[in-house]
């Protein structure tokens, strides 16, 4: 299915530990480039996140951001560092014995850095939930790419219809153009008072027809239209293939323009260039 390289997705999850939000956005890029902004607690997840993205996307500049907000009320139970507390009590008693002044305040002991600490949250369990949310965010992200891709596909198909119409128009004009050119050549010879034998005249007319004959270019343009339709039906990433097809379209339209000796053909050649350029602009954003 056709996918755009421009997309955005956001997904938030909540648990007893707090909340986490994934945000993903991307723009067109020749290759796949990934950029991450992860909180310090989950910086180690970057290789896993990068690999999961690479297995599902092939092109685009992708920015991936994780916001993590722990719930203060969900902190674990307080843990007493008994060893440190005993050391502080012993030190306080020694000071009292030396000066025979002051009393030990238990609250002061508990306030001492490192004596009391909240039990750390299970970051591994939280990381598992966060990675599951990443998979869901990627699902949403790909759906957004595919939705935009279908819109791009419709625009390209409209331009392909325009190309086919211009090809048919030029093909319909060719007998008339050849006859007009024949009469023009004969008139020039008469004006120049040049008399040619019938065989020689026919040879000149054949050579002239070969120079302005665009049947091959029209055939190839029609073949390119058909092949582009086939590419648009493929399920894998097709951006590079479509870009190559636009190069082929350009080559034939340039040849058609160079052979043009008629205003109608010239106008069609110009219109073809416009249609091809419009398709190329859309294709630059296809994965």
UniProtKB/Swiss-Prot annotation:
Enzyme class: hydrolase
Domain of life, source organism: Bacteria
InterPro entries, per database record: YicC-like_C, YicC-like_N, YicC/YloC-like
GO MF assignments: RNA endonuclease activity, producing 5'-phosphomonoesters
GO biological process, one term: RNA catabolic process
Disruption phenotype: In strain JSG210, wild-type growth rate and motility, increased biofilm production in vitro, decreased persistence in inoculated tomato cotyledons (cv. Tiny Tim seedlings). Wild-type strain JSG210 has high persistence in tomato plant organs; fresh produce contaminated with Salmonella contributes to food safety risks.
Keyword line: Endonuclease, Hydrolase, Nuclease
Record's protein name: Probable endoribonuclease YicC
Annotated organism of origin: Salmonella typhimurium (strain LT2 / SGSC1412 / ATCC 700720)
Organism lineage string: Bacteria, Pseudomonadati, Pseudomonadota, Gammaproteobacteria, Enterobacterales
């Amino acid at each position: 299915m056709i996918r755009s390289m421009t997309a955005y997705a956001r997904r938030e999850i909540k648990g007893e530990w707090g909340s986490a939000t994934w945000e993903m956005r991307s723009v067109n890029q020749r290759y796949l480039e990934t950029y991450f902004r992860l909180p310090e607690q989950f910086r180690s997840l970057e290789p896993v996140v990068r690999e999961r993205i690479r297995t599902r996307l092939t092109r685009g500049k992708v920015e991936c951001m994780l916001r993590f907000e722990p719930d203060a009320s969900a902190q674990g139970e307080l843990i007493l560092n008994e060893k440190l507390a005993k050391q502080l009590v012993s030190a306080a008693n020694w000071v009292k014995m030396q000066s025979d002044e002051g009393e030990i305040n238990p609250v002061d002991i508990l306030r001492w850095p490192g004596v009391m600490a909240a039990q750390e949250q299970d970051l591994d369990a939280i990381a598992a939930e966060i990675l599951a949310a990443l998979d869901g965010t990627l699902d949403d992200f790909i759906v957004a790419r595919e939705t935009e891709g279908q819109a791009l596909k419709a625009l390209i198909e409209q331009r392909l219809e325009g190309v086919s119409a211009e090809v048919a128009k030029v093909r319909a004009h060719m007998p008339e153009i050849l006859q007009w050119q024949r009469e023009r050549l004969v008139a020039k010879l008469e004006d120049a008072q040049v008399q040619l034998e019938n065989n020689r005249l026919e040879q000149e007319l054949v050579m002239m027809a070969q120079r302005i004959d665009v049947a091959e270019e029209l055939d190839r343009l029609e073949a390119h239209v058909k092949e582009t339709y086939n590419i648009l039906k493929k399920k894998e990433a097709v951006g590079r293939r479509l870009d190559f097809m636009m190069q082929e379209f350009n080559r034939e339209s340039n040849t058609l323009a160079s052979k043009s000796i008629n205003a109608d053909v010239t106008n069609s050649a110009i219109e073809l260039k416009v249609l091809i350029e419009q398709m190329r602009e859309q294709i630059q954003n296809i994965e």
